[in-house]
């Protein structure tokens, strides 16, 4: 890499002398050469071009470490780069190089705000060099999506990408398909998408006729059942295990013989009710908004509008809360992020925290993690954890620490794990008269997320935020001049393009008043930044160790960006979830036996905390690995069905498919022919008769009817199959208690279900075709 870096730096000097049109011409030449040469051979010239483009358009000079990061991305690896090291610019180099093939590049971000920001900001460099860029958001129309995927570089969120993939495989005509074949993808915050969200499948569902009654009945039974007597809980995996007494109690209450029957799966309803009772807590896992249960993302703390828990769990929570129970949805299509991103021939990622999960990235995705050194030396001090015996004493200590810092004027960012806890701290600070900004999933607060986080580095700023809220937005010591200028310009002009006004200011092309305001803000910012640095920079307080050291490191990483001063400390208690579930009881015993005063700092406790956290990390890794193993079974079936469906959709003539399906499921009974008389000529004759009938009405009608009925039958049977696979997955775990390997059982039974589905598709299609009337 050092040799390549030296070549790029030497070559870049030539590019300084080139005119804008000459840089664009370079892009055209490189595109032509990409047809014959490898991207590795084009890298030196491509990266030199982007470097010069960024210097001219954004006034940004790339650092050596950014160029190294870009080389890592081009290799199809993960570049671990700390907060504030300029990952967005790094992606510009690798995306430009890989776009030269003409096959398209996707840059995937965690939210629409970041996708729009990067396409507008970094995308300007790519457009300057002659590439086409596009952004696809939640609001994009089908036409905009289609055009967006045709661009050289497309900025998009992981969920939009996944749902477009699923919708394309439910399309009824070629014109409805928006995506082209996947080529190269760079995932920003790759750990958030490929690890934190790996357990949550993307689901497209449709309403199904169902009754509210089973959920209400199951809730009434579930809330009266007793833990330990009727059921046991596996808190780590959020699983419910019904005991013999509990099963009998359910069967008596419901007056059924077997609650595990596939025909009347009452066990499914009751276990969901018990899960809703114990594991899904209001203002932690969800909020009630306008009479609806709305999910709160456990990793980002944001509400997930439009998303619902699958398999009847959402309805169970609605029954618990006494709100309107919405119709249970029928899964029409689904895919996990694990399998979605494995569809790319070449995949890369960026994040500030990946090294702790490098085994998982390597094992599941085949992605190597490469740590990129920081441009400036890290100055942040990470202090040892302070441990309290009770949660109450911990929160009092956090509030006191915030008050102490607020009095000094030092900015503080406090990370909490839920809405409930963020509001608890807010109340404690109010009692002390400490001013703060609160950021959590409540809609009234979430709207200002980016601006609140951007100004969290100002003097006297106390910001309480759930989990990873504001990730992707830099916290600049002394505040963010751009945000402050944006607020001022909005007050001055009602209809204003802030990005355009900001660009004019940077280029010295703004009006006199704007130039004057910018100068004033810059002077104020420099003074404030100096003062904040003297106070020690941003102080990050963690209020709970997370299930992964990586998430703790993300919170710490909000401080000390680009060599800034800063510090972090975690305040934790033995009542926190991590310690309670994975070993807090043992430490509580030791502390009470030793009669230790609160609070406590010790090497022994820190090691115990690390051990507990590693245990959790390994536990969840094994869960994700198991999910991946099970999902591979469904994934191979999905690939087969989607290939068949796509081939039918894209084919000009579908007659051969039609005949193939009919031969295997000849519905002779419909024509008064005995089953035993089936032969090839009968099939051909009957098919030709049907075709003549249809063609006599309209030329090409038979072909379109066949296509429609084939797609219809595939979709109907696939949706039914997904439901059966979901039930099988839920009940198969019980085989483990009978000393049988659940995964082997799942593979065997899912194969039988798949064969049954194929037969249903053929049979259903054959009958539909011969029953159809012109």
Swiss-Prot record:
Domain of life where this protein originates: Eukaryota
EC code: 7.4.2.8
Chloroplast found in the keyword field: yes
Sequence positions that bind ATP: 66, 84-88, 474
Protein's cellular compartments: Plastid, Chloroplast stroma; Plastid, Chloroplast thylakoid membrane
UniProt cross-references to PANTHER family, sorted A to Z: CHLOROPLAST PROTEIN-TRANSPORTING ATPASE, SECA INNER MEMBRANE COMPONENT OF SEC PROTEIN SECRETION SYSTEM
Family according to the record: Belongs to the SecA family.
Protein known as: Protein translocase subunit SecA
């Amino acid at each position: 890499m050092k040799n390549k870096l030296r070549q790029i730096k030497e070559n870049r000097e030539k590019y300084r002398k080139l005119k804008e049109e000459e840089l664009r011409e370079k892009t055209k030449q490189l595109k032509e050469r990409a047809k014959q040469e490898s991207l590795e051979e084009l890298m030196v010239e491509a990266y030199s071009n982007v470097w010069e483009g960024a210097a001219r358009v954004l006034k940004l000079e790339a650092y050596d470490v950014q160029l190294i990061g870009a080389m890592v991305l081009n290799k199809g690896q993960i570049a671990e780069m700390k907060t504030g090291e300029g990952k967005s610019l790094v992606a510009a180099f690798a995306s430009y190089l890989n776009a030269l093939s003409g096959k398209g590049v996707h840059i995937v971000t965690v939210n629409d705000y970041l996708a729009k920001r990067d396409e507008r900001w970094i995308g300007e460099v790519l457009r300057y060099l002659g590439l086409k860029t596009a952004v696809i958001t939640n609001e994009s129309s089908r036409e905009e999506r289609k055009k967006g995927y045709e661009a050289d570089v497309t900025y998009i969120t992981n969920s939009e990408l996944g749902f477009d993939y699923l919708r394309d495989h439910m399309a009824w005509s070629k014109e409805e398909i928006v995506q082209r074949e996947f080529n190269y993808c760079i995932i920003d915050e790759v750990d958030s998408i490929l690890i934190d969200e790996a357990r949550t499948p993307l689901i497209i569902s449709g309403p199904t006729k169902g009754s509210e009654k089973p959920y209400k009945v199951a809730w009434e039974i579930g809330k009266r059942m007793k833990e330990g007597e009727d059921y046991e809980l596996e808190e780590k995996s959020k699983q419910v295990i019904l005991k013999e007494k509990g099963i009998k109690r359910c069967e008596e209450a419901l007056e059924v013989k077997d609650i595990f029957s596939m025909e009347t799966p009452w066990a499914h309803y009751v276990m969901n009710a018990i899960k809703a009772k114990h594991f899904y807590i209001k203002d932690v896992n969800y909020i009630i908004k306008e009479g609806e249960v709305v999910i709160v993302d456990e990793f980002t703390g944001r509400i997930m509008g439009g998303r619902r828990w699958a398999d009847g769990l959402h309805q169970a929570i609605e029954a618990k809360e006494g709100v309107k129970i919405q119709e249970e949805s029928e899964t029409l299509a689904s895919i996990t992020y694990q399998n979605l991103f494995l569809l790319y021939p070449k995949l890369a990622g960026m994040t500030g925290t990946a090294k702790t999960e490098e085994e998982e990235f390597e094992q599941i995705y085949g992605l190597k993690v490469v740590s990129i050194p920081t441009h400036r030396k890290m100055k942040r001090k990470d202090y040892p954890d302070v441990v309290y015996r009770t949660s109450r004493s911990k929160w009092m200590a956090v509030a006191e620490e915030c008050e102490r810092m607020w009095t000094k004027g030092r900015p503080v960012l406090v990370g909490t794990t839920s809405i409930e806890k963020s509001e608890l701290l807010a109340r404690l600070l109010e009692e002390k008269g400490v001013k703060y900004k609160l950021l959590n999933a409540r809609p009234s607060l979430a709207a200002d997320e980016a601006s609140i986080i951007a100004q969290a580095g100002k003097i006297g700023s106390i910001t309480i935020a759930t989990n990873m809220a504001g990730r992707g937005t830099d916290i600049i010591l002394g505040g963010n001049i751009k945000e402050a200028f944006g607020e001022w310009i909005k007050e001055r002009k009602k209809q204003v393009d802030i990005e355009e006004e900001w660009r004019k200011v940077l280029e010295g092309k703004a009006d006199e008043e704007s130039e004057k305001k910018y100068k004033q803000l810059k002077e104020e910012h420099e003074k404030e930044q100096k003062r904040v640095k003297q106070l020690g920079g941003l102080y990050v307080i963690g209020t709970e160790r997370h299930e992964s050291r990586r998430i703790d490191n993300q919170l710490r990483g909000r401080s000390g960006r680009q060599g800034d001063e800063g510090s972090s400390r975690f305040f934790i208690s033995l009542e926190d979830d991590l310690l309670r579930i994975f070993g807090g009881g043992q430490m509580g015993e030791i502390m009470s036996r030793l009669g230790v005063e609160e609070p406590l700092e010790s090497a022994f406790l820190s090691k115990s905390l690390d051990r507990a956290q590693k245990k959790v990390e390994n536990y969840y890794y094994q869960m994700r690995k198991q999910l991946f193993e099970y999902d591979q079974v469904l994934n191979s079936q999905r690939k087969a069905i989607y290939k068949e469906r796509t081939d039918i959709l894209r084919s000009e003539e579908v007659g051969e498919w039609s005949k193939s399906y009919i031969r295997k499921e000849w519905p002779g009974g419909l024509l008064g022919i005995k089953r035993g008389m089936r032969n090839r000529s009968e099939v051909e004759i009957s098919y030709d008769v049907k075709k003549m009938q249809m063609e006599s009405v309209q030329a090409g009608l038979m072909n379109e009817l066949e296509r429609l009925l084939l797609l219809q039958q595939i979709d109907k049977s696939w949706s039914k199959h997904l439901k059966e696979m979901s039930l099988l997955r839920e009940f198969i775990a019980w085989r483990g208690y009978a000393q049988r390997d659940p995964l082997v059982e799942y593979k065997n039974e899912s194969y039988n279900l798949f064969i049954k589905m194929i037969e249903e598709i053929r049979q259903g299609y054959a009958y539909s075709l011969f029953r159809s009337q012109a």
